């Protein structure tokens, strides 16, 4: 009887050992790691998307401010000190934290890539009708180029796509100055540790 019990115990022990060994075979460990990798990847993706939405939420009011500065000449000026340049355009000294063109550019480049700026905003500084320029060491604005309007951005409804290690794309709905509902596709690029706008395309079709 004792011999029979001993044999049964030995058989159970052998079976348990075999099961444990099977769980620790390369294929089993690989399956466990694979399962962990998938769940971890899902978690990272979710966090990255949430982080991207937060970036858009914080960034859009600032980005829109610069859009208005460069495209609508929105910086306040002292009209009592206006001058007329050699091309016949009226310029007034800017009354803001930006006292020179260099200081304006330095702040702008915190939020936009240089490549984007050179192909968009900075083009409005380049010729004889420049929207802004330094006169006698101070920033002046072309008051003949002023336009009105403001876009209202709904960052709570933005859609994030194309997430990579170096950036993402955000589609953000907005209400334009004509009260038309539209959207913009904005590409953010990681530049020296900061997500900056590298592309900004306005969809002019009403939605």
Describe these PLM feature segments:
Residues 21-23:
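Bacterial signal peptide processing site
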Residues 27-207:
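Mature, Sec-exported extracytoplasmic domains of Gram-positive
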Residues 16-19:
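C-terminal motif of bacterial Sec signal peptides marking the signal peptidase cleavage site
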Residues 1-5:
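Positively charged n-region of N-terminal signal peptides that target proteins for export
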């Amino acid at each position: 009887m004792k011999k029979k019990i001993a044999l049964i115990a030995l058989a159970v022990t052998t079976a348990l050992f075999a099961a444990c060994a099977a769980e620790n075979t390369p294929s089993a460990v690989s399956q466990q790691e694979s399962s962990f990798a998938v769940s971890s990847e899902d978690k990272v993706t979710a966090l990255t998307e949430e982080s991207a939405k937060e970036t858009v939420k914080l960034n859009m009011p600032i980005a829109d401010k610069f859009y208005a500065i460069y495209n609508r000449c929105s910086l306040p000026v002292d009209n009592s000190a206006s001058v007329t340049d050699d091309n016949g355009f009226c310029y007034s000294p800017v009354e803001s934290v930006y006292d020179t063109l260099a200081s304006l550019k330095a702040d702008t480049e915190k939020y936009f890539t240089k490549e984007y700026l050179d192909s968009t905003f900075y083009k409005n500084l380049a010729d004889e009708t420049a929207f802004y320029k330094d006169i006698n060491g101070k920033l002046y604005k072309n008051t003949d180029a002023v336009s009105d309007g403001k876009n209202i951005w709904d960052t709570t409804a933005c859609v994030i796509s194309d997430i990579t290690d170096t950036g993402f794309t955000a589609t953000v709905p907005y209400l334009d100055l004509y009260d038309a509902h539209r959207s913009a596709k904005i590409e953010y690029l990681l530049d020296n540790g900061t997500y900056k706008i590298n592309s900004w395309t306005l969809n002019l079709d009403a939605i």
